[in-house]
């Protein structure tokens, strides 16, 4: 599954950067980070991607709670360290937990389109009540806490001003 949209990929290419090769934990590379939209770049920003992805799961609501709680705990650690990139990457993984779980709630196979076409397959009858729908609600709840937190909003605004 391609998480990075072509629009985000184009931004990175215009910068002449291969995000997969940059270590964003190094001070000299931190200014290269771009927030993007939604979950853009979530699988590209190393080492954060590698660390957070190990805890990202949504197969059942129980697993989603454990995953979202762990990612939120990581968010708090990054916040306490003043690491906005880590905070934003946690937000992106929470966003991706929501969107991917919704995809499976809507289409149990994970496939939205009829094979070989752009025809959208019908939604599952239980798309609002399935285990994936509940997992999506869990991730959205935690994502909203992060995205609306005073610290995140302030640090995001500061980061945007320097992009």
What residue ranges belong to the model's regions?
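Short, charge-rich, low-complexity alpha-helical interaction segments
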Residues: 13-61
């Amino acid at each position: 599954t391609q998480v990075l949209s072509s629009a985000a990929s184009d931004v990175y290419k215009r910068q002449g950067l291969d995000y997969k090769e940059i270590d964003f934990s190094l001070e000299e590379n931190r200014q290269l980070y771009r927030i993007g939209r939604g979950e853009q770049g979530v699988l590209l920003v190393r080492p954060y991607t590698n660390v957070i992805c190990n805890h990202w799961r949504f197969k059942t609501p129980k697993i989603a709670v454990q995953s979202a709680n762990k990612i939120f705990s990581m968010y708090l650690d990054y916040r306490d360290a003043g690491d906005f990139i880590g905070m934003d990457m946690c937000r992106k993984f929470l966003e991706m937990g929501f969107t991917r779980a919704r995809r499976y709630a809507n289409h149990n196979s994970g496939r939205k389109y009829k094979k070989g076409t752009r025809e959208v397959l019908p939604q599952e009858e239980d798309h609002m009540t399935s285990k994936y729908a509940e997992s999506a609600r869990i991730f959205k709840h935690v994502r909203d806490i992060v995205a609306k937190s005073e610290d995140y909003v302030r640090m995001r605004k500061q980061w945007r001003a320097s992009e």
